[in-house]
Amino acid sequence: MNYNQPATLQAAILDWAGTVVDFGSFAPTQIFVEAFAEFGVQVSLEEARGPMGMGKWDHIRTLCDIPAIAERYRAVFGRLPSDDDVTAIYERFMPLQIEKIAEHSALIPGALQAIAELRGMGLKIGSCSGYPAVVMEKVVALAETNGYVADHVVATDEVPNGRPWPAQALANVIALGIDDVAACVKVDDTWPGILEGRRAGMWTVALTCSGNALGLTYEQYKALPAAELERERTRIEQMFEGSRPHYLIETIAELPAVVRDINARLARGEMPQGN
């Protein structure tokens, strides 16, 4: 039996916050700030956004490893934060996140139309998130009331290793019955999510304006002067360089055009691993 590379995409694997819901990815960011504050440790929104895309325990561990934050913790507790301390912050983070997730549950403008267009091209819709399953249950239910239902959902605690490991993306491949990772495109607003897709052998699309990197509401994004938006796009594109996305677009609304381009490249014999 011979290997035949895929002729078209079979699935899009979409992130959630900052990709399909919660323009600006505010739900997790603000809660990190509040969770640390309950322990008397100040963390800025900008600092909290840094590791976005990782599982939430790993995100907190990464924040605690930042020297400035570690020193703030030491000033309060007389020691550097241990894994047990990270777990204590995480256990405070979780109920806050569940309580407030609905405040940032709106679908990103253009998402439903783009996803419908992908389905019309024959793609299945997988999804994964840095949220654990207990939070994803609520996120999924809220999205369903707004008209979005993915074909499969993988939470960060449903695999041995979250992003930037490829496990969540690959779990979607298995569950959706996709026969080749090169027939998948991973879409995300964070570098760990792009690395996840890259390591899974997929096409990758980074979102520059709807998520964590820009960190603005939709209204603020639309109101940005053209010159400032261009500067921000340049900054964000540089941030993504290390993870090597195949495409960079502003929001999911532009995704159908990218899928058509990937299909054309597959038809020419191109593969994601070779680019």
UniProtKB/Swiss-Prot annotation:
Disulfide connectivity?
none
Q: Where along the chain is the active site annotated?
A: 15, 56
Names of the cofactor(s): Mg(2+)
Instruction: Write down the superkingdom of origin.
Output: Bacteria
Family matches, as Pfam families: Hydrolase (PF00702)
- EC numbers on record: 3.11.1.1
Q: Which UniProt keywords apply?
A: Hydrolase, Magnesium, Metal-binding, Schiff base
Question: What is a single molecular function from GO for this protein?
Answer: phosphoglycolate phosphatase activity
> Which GO CC annotations does the UniProt entry carry?
cytosol
Reaction(s) this enzyme catalyzes, per UniProt: phosphonoacetaldehyde + H2O = acetaldehyde + phosphate + H(+)
Return the Gene3D superfamilies for the record: HAD superfamily/HAD-like, Putative phosphatase, domain 2
CDD domains in alphabetical order? HAD_PHN
GO biological process terms held by the UniProt record: DNA repair; organic phosphonate catabolic process
Annotated Mg(2+) binding sites: 15, 17, 189
Q: How is the cofactor bound?
A: Binds 1 Mg(2+) ion per subunit.
SUPFAM superfamilies assigned to the protein according to its UniProt record, in alphabetical order:
HAD-like
Annotated InterPro entries: HAD-like_hydrolase_sf, HAD-like_sf, HAD-SF_hydro_IA, HAD_sf, PGP-like_dom2, Phosphonoacetald_hydro
What's this protein's family per the entry?
Belongs to the HAD-like hydrolase superfamily. PhnX family.
Q: How does it assemble?
A: Homodimer.
Please give the function described in this protein's UniProt entry: Involved in phosphonate degradation.
Q: What is this protein called?
A: Phosphonoacetaldehyde hydrolase
Gene source species: Pseudomonas aeruginosa (strain UCBPP-PA14)
